[in-house]
Amino acid sequence: MRRSTDPRNLLVRRGPLLVDGESAISELDPGFFPTGDAPKMSSTTRRRFNLIAFTPGPVTVISSLVYLALLIPLLLVHTIVPSAPKSNPKGVDLSEAWNDLQHLTSGFHPYNSHRNDEIHQWLLQRVGHILDASRKAHEDDAMGSVAPDVFVFDDQQSNLTFSGGGVGNKPITGVYFEGKNIIVYIRGLEDDKENWWDSPGGKPKGKGGVLVNAHYDSVSTGFGATDDGVGVVSVLQLIKFFTSPGNLPRKGLVLLLNNGEEDYLNGARAYSQHPLSKYTHTFLNLEGAGAGGRAALFRTTDIEVTRFYKSSPHPFGSVLAADGFKMGLIRSETDYAVFKGVLGLRGLDVAFIEPRARYHTDQDDVRHTSIDSVWHMLSAAIATTKGLVSYTGSEFDGRAPGKGMVNSGVGTHGVWFDLFGSSFAVFRLHTLFAISVTLLVVCPIVLFVIGIILSKMDKMYLFSIHETIPETKEKVSVRGLRGLFRYPIILVVSSGILIGLSYLLAKVNPFIVHSSSYAVWSMMLSSWIFMTWFLSCIADFFRPSALHRAYTFTWQLLVMWVLLVISTVYVNQHDIAAGYFIVFYFAGTFLATLISYLELFALPNKTRYAREQSQYPSRLGSNRSSRILSPSADELPTGGDNNGEIYDGEEEPTESSSLLGRQRRTTFANYTRTGRDLASSESGTYEDHSETGVFGEEQKWSASLPTWTWVLQFLFVGPVVIMFIGQLGLFLTSAMNQVGADGVGLLVVYIAIAVFSVLLLIPLSPFIHRFTYHVPTFLLLVFIATLIYNLAAFPFSAENRLKIFFVQELNLDTGRNQVSLTGVDPYVQDIIRAIPSASKENISCDSELDSGRRKCSWPGLAPEVVQDEPTDRWLSFNISKPSSQETKDTPVLHARLHVSGKNTRACRVNFERPIRDYSLPGSALDDRMPHTLPQGISEIRLWSRTWENVWTVDVQWDAEDMDELHGRVVCLWSDANQLGSIPALDELRLFAPPWVAISKLKDGLVEVSRGF
């Protein structure tokens, strides 16, 4: 029997069959092909070696390289601190700064410690030595420079009574504090030459100055290297820099070393009572909430001051952190809150942010920081301060932002972020809003117009099922609807798995992120990539579609449009700029989607294609799907003649023929492959680079689609997303991965990592079905390994310790001596069992406090914080007999308390029921910080600059509430420098497991109380 050569009876198959079939057709009708030209043999070779074609090899390699090329630098920037210069920059001595840091952190120095007094005197001496060296440098200067006027204030007078806390209707906490701040004022070249602060009621003239602040007190359980030792030595170096020849400031510079920040920002509040607080209009606050690493720009008041940080050699930070404070997601505070909220200054908060496990512990020391970290903060401080003191405009000399505040003007909300730690972007929030609104309106219109044009040109293959031939009314399938709902299903399934993994980790091993955040990231990323690839390949196997990219980008654009709407609303109504990355994400997605729509112009019009298909039907739909399932309605050409002889590229079968054809083998689900199919499969792909340019079993009209535009699409979306999402994801992980010890639920951390993993990898979705199996298979192995590790590994180590919180409480009324540890259950009980003195005691644990934290107590070793005194004499107080006073509303009772403690300068008075008012003779009051509120005062904290001070406290309460005053007087001891003063703490440090870090629970390490 002769082989049929009638093209109407040819079923075009894969491999050589397709070539033979199409060659026969092209000989009869070259116009059959959408391009109008029959393919040439050489085109296959060129396409096969096209390095940017939309084929598995280039897609896998290019996508992987782009991700690696951007993620690796992001990781390096995030984990490696830029090296300090080998030689000292002009006006700075890094060796001197490092030596100062070593001396400062040689012991614990909280406000309520004798070491704190020693540090105070040492700082005064250091300032004096720096100024002496500066004067000598000016005398030796060949240019004949004149040393600036510098004034050093050892503020031993400022005190203040104020209140804090009291959310809603809850009673507030009253505070009396006596400051011990050190203030250095360097007179600017353009400053008023009069010492206006010496005159009662004197006021500064001219432009406002610049304040740089750091606090020199530490917590009682931390050496304070980064909190805030690096800030302190940076201030000392700023004094050195701005008093050196050639560096004199044009505007006055105030450098504040405040004492008492760790105890509710008391030092900054005391500064508000000093005359110089009226002079400064801008500020730079140097802080630390970690141990080493890079100093991040944590938050700023406005764009005008933020621009001066831009000149930092290694800027680092994002507006996301600032918005975290605005939305109440970050609960800790710094002196920034006082300078901005009370004084009305405009400025910046620069702080170390990781690792939080070392924050307020004995690992906040010089061994866990570096000279590089010192230089990172110092260089940023020099650049920012230099810009502020050199600025002579009137930007910061406007109307006061509030009552009692300085005339610093009102700033503009801004957006800011760094790029790879080397450049810094800053622009107005209104600009972000304008761009967002423009994109929201213009982008849909552009796509709508293009869609109309494509429809007019009869090239809108998207959303098309079939095309009707006008002459015969015959309907021909174009299969343009294929893949429409593929992407949302895949996205939901793949992302849902990550959410499930988040819940799994939070349930089985919630603290693994504490020490192994990168393992969690690896698990999330590898899981999403493999599952998305697997589902995409299944969909492409059964229903291949050349419109997969177009539909995927369209769905992504729709989702990003909704997110951009939400972000724009927050920008407009709440001044929240944290969604700035969505603007760039949306813009890149729009450009990629636009390219997919523009590609359709290269296709033949649908009517012509339908005529050609009707005249020369080439196949019954997809070979893959049709061999497994019956052809669907959109795959069969209506009315076509499909009963002719089918040519499959093999000889007519005879009695001696093989049961299977030479080129055909049965595979999955009896799907018959040709020899070339099998070869492709064995090489890791199932592609078919036929002469027509159609990939695999995709729609025949797709031969006219360009094969290189995917690179543009990926470059529009991929790098932008990686840079922004990668940076923010790492930043958030560093800030959040170790908050579980503080009582914060870790599920939100895992979900945040899952969400950022999805956002980071979404750019791969339109292309991932073209990946070869090598990368996904490797990532499957990574996923399995990291999943097992994350579920089974112990979450703490000597480098990433679990923080527990210590306090010892002694009740003089009952003689009860109780040591308490607060931490995460069950670890806190495991730790207590390792303590010898607790091994035979009855351990009592309170009910769960927050997110698994419990307070467990036992009778502990007696404290020795006061030498040669019996315990019952460690604190003393007396209360005068209440006296009444009639008011318009209700009778008020008065009483006077005298409170004192041995070897301490911190006590407090707790009341069983809130009192109405209180006062201390000689204390300053400030309307900007009211000392009482209508809901009353439940506690008064007392701080003195002198040891064993006697506080006199007058209190008032409503007679109808109580006839007599009831409560407790508590005195605090926070000095743990001397071994043996707090034996229970010494024992805990000696016997606790190496994966445990000890921090303070309350203001005092030891608290002794007596009732009244």
UniProtKB/Swiss-Prot annotation:
Keyword Methyltransferase attached: no
Residue intervals passing through the bilayer: 61-81, 433-453, 488-508, 519-539, 551-571, 576-596, 711-731, 744-764, 778-798
Region Disordered: start-end pairs: 614-660
GO molecular function: metal ion binding; metalloexopeptidase activity
GO cellular component: vacuolar membrane
Co-factor remark: Binds 2 Zn(2+) ions per subunit.
Site (Transition state stabilizer): Y359
Record: residues binding Zn(2+) 2: D227, E262, H360
Lipid bilayer topology: Multi-pass membrane protein
Binding locations of Zn(2+) 1: H215, D227, E287
Glycosylation sites: N159, N842, N878
Cofactor(s) essential for the protein: Zn(2+)
EC number per UniProt: 3.4.-.-
Domain of life where this protein originates: Eukaryota
Vacuolar side: 82-432, 509-518, 572-575, 732-743, 799-1012
Enzyme class: hydrolase
SUPFAM superfamilies to which the protein is assigned, alphabetical: Zn-dependent exopeptidases
Biased composition annotated in UniProt, kind: Polar residues: 614-629
UniProt record, GO biological process: proteolysis
InterPro entries reported for this sequence: Fxna-like_M28_dom, M28_fam, Peptidase_M28, PFF1_C, PFF1_TM
Cytoplasmic side: 1-60, 454-487, 540-550, 597-710, 765-777
Annotated active site: E261
Family listed: Belongs to the peptidase M28 family.
Function: May be involved in vacuolar sorting and osmoregulation.
Protein name per Swiss-Prot or TrEMBL: Vacuolar membrane protease
Organism in which the protein naturally occurs: Coccidioides posadasii (strain C735)
